[in-house]
């Protein structure tokens, strides 16, 4: 069988952010974790420094913050990418804008967590608003298909 998928104008921006920008951010954060691992003295396969290590060694604490920020990104990536690709079929401009906002907020979240040890210190929690908006647009798209 042959299927034809017609995408709206601007859908390329949705794909560029969902399948380009988001994985790039994950790669960057993964590299930050790798860079911070050696000074923290956390050997593989340990994912985190122990509580005792982090308490005594600021580098270990910073490593844990970077690792947790990256893990949180990985936890939120799949649904964000999926909702973008689906919602963008009906609302490409708003979806691309929310996706870009999500990327920016996730970057601020990670930077604030690593640099200042506070997850929401730089407004990074705004990613939840963007993610909620993408979910709502996905639901609206699904309702239009009924």
Task: State what each model feature region is.
Residues 108-133:
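Interfacial loop-to-transmembrane junctions
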Residues 83-104:
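Short alpha-helical packing/oligomerization segments
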Residues 9-52:
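N-terminal signal-anchor transmembrane alpha helix
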Residues 22-25, 29, 78, 101-109, ...:
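Membrane-embedded alpha-helical transmembrane segments of multi-pass integral membrane proteins
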Residues 11-19, 98, 123-130:
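Transmembrane alpha-helices of multi-pass eukaryotic membrane proteins
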Residues 50-73:
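Short membrane-interface loop/juxtamembrane segments of multi-pass integral membrane proteins
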Residues 139-146:
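Juxtamembrane boundary at the C-terminal end of a transmembrane helix
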Residues 71-84, 134:
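Core segments of transmembrane alpha-helices
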């Amino acid at each position: 069988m042959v299927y034809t998928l017609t995408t709206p104008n601007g859908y390329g921006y949705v794909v560029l952010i969902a399948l380009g920008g988001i994985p790039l951010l994950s790669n960057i954060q993964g590299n930050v974790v790798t860079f911070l691992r050696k000074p923290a003295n956390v050997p593989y396969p340990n994912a985190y420094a122990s509580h005792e290590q982090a308490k005594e060694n600021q580098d270990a604490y910073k490593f844990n913050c970077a690792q947790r920020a990256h893990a949180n990104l990985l936890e939120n990536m799949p649904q964000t990418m999926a909702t973008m690709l689906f919602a963008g079929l009906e609302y490409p401009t708003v979806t691309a804008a929310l996706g870009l906002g999500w990327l920016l907020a996730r970057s601020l979240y990670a930077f604030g967590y690593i640099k200042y040890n506070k997850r929401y210190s730089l407004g990074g929690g705004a990613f939840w608003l963007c993610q909620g908006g993408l979910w709502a647009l996905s639901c609206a798209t699904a309702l239009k298909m009924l």
